Amino acid sequence: MNNYISGATTAIITPFKNGTLDEATYANLIQRQIDNNIDAICPVGTTGESATLSHDEHKRCIEIAVEVCKGSNAKVLAGAGSNATHEAIDIAKHAEACGVDALFSVSPYYNKPSQEGLYQHYKAIASAVEVPFMLYNVPGRTGVDILPDTVKRLFDDVWNIMGIKEATGSIERTVELLAKVPDLYVFSGDDSIDFPILASGGKGITSVTANLLPDMKADLTHAALRGDFKTSKAINDELFEINKVLFCESNPIPIKAAMYIAGLIDTLEYRLPLVPPSSENMKKIENVMKKYKIVGA
């Protein structure tokens, strides 16, 4: 399999209007990413509020992403996660039928499977499709960590498992993964450490901040992948403050607020139990956007 995704990918938000998916705005957001050299769109992940979307909404988000990206250089790396394996398989099969380029799947949350359970879960989902497949490890949100030995076992045993989005916040984890699985495609899942992960051998990033600043995230990633670490680090350093502010509350609360302030979405709507930022944090977001001279701030 030689059609792996690498580079800068965006964990796209899901805009709502009057409680429903705002399809027109969603399509516009994706097109903006394409216009700013993002390599792939990642719909219906954590940032896309997948946990509170209906299955029909989840599938529609993927359909729109494929429609908008068709004919462009941008690929679709779609979310197919669930803590019920059969549901994840259903989503994955639908996404494949829509024409996505690859899939990522968050580790099962709440039910906390063992490493053997994680192995069987991912083996079942990836084996149900024939597109490249990425694990998504974010133990701070799911309560379970996909350990490197389990990643290696999956990589060795399942032909289309090609990588992992690593959101442990640990650079050492990336180093360990690549020591054990040199051909693994590791993607940074933490905006503040994109450069260190790329410099350690990572093949890409999946960014929240790219919703707002896709051009800078694309430049950071592409510089690192061509070996221009000086440029990549300089951009990573420049983005450090806004990266931190955009995680002042649970993702995607701050990034959606920032997108609203910037005029990129029409309404600031979340699905309960998520609610808008506190007034104190909203002020932080407004201030950092002014500092970065982002339109609308």
From Swiss-Prot:
The record marks T46, Y110 as: Part of a proton relay during catalysis. It is an enzyme of class 4 (lyase). Keywords: Amino-acid biosynthesis, Cytoplasm, Diaminopimelate biosynthesis, Lyase, Lysine biosynthesis, Schiff base. Disulfide bonds: none annotated. Pathway: Amino-acid biosynthesis; L-lysine biosynthesis via DAP pathway; (S)-tetrahydrodipicolinate from L-aspartate: step 3/4. The keyword Lyase applies. One of its GO terms (cellular component) is cytosol. Pyruvate binds at T47, T206. SUPFAM superfamilies: Aldolase (SSF51569). Its main location: cytoplasm. InterPro entries: Aldolase_TIM, DapA, DapA-like, Schiff_base-form_aldolases_AS. It catalyses: L-aspartate 4-semialdehyde + pyruvate = (2S,4S)-4-hydroxy-2,3,4,5-tetrahydrodipicolinate + H2O + H(+). Pfam families: DHDPS. One of its GO terms (biological process) is diaminopimelate biosynthetic process. Its EC number is 4.3.3.7. One of its GO terms (molecular function) is 4-hydroxy-tetrahydrodipicolinate synthase activity. The active site is at Y136 (proton donor/acceptor), K165 (schiff-base intermediate with substrate). It is found in: Cytoplasm. NCBIfam families: dapA (TIGR00674). Homotetramer; dimer of dimers. Catalyzes the condensation of (S)-aspartate-beta-semialdehyde [(S)-ASA] and pyruvate to 4-hydroxy-tetrahydrodipicolinate (HTPA). Belongs to the DapA family. This is 4-hydroxy-tetrahydrodipicolinate synthase. It comes from Sulfurovum sp. (strain NBC37-1). The lineage of its organism: Bacteria, Pseudomonadati, Campylobacterota, Epsilonproteobacteria, Campylobacterales. The gene is dapA.
